[in-house]
Amino acid sequence: EKIKGGDRSSAIEREDSTKEEAHTAEIELLGLFAHSYQGDSRGAEVFTRLGVHTEYTDRGVKLTRKGTPATRLDEDMVDIPDLAQTFVVTCCLMDIPFRFTGLQSLKIKETDRITALITELRKLGYVVRSEQDSILLWDGERCPADADPVIATYEDHRMAMAFAPACLVLPQIQIDEPQVVTKSYPAYWEDLQKAGFKVCQNAMQS
């Protein structure tokens, strides 16, 4: 199958949807609070530098596009490796060069996420490089993009969630094996639809 266009690690994937909007956007995530016990709460700090304002309420958190994004992002992600895919994809789509360190654990996750990111982003026209099996960087280099890119998920839920909001920039993008999101966020596609995304699901023959 392919898809077209309360866990903080999963919910943070929604923040890149706000970030990539071409206009002011607002998303409310219920049940997430400032003093999270999950390390991924630091992701909100990083998104601030990309122009996403985080406001905590008694219901959860409200995310709003606000401010001027950084022109470059250098970040040690040793404490938030599960968010690396989201930030890598978001920065590329925003044309923000980056250098992310502390990613040594990505080689031994559900898939080799470093290689997967490099491979799939090339389909979108971005030449991302790695160093020392623990660093991902992009200096703005581009390459010819696929006309109708199909993103492989490698049986990795975070690959699907990191690339899905790219449809805001590339409406023709497709996500292969979308059901992988059930590992951490079973309602991900339904929630995207509620947020205003058009999600089309097609059965594909192997």
Please state what every model-predicted region is:
Residues 1-206:
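Short, structured segments at the rim of ligand-binding sites
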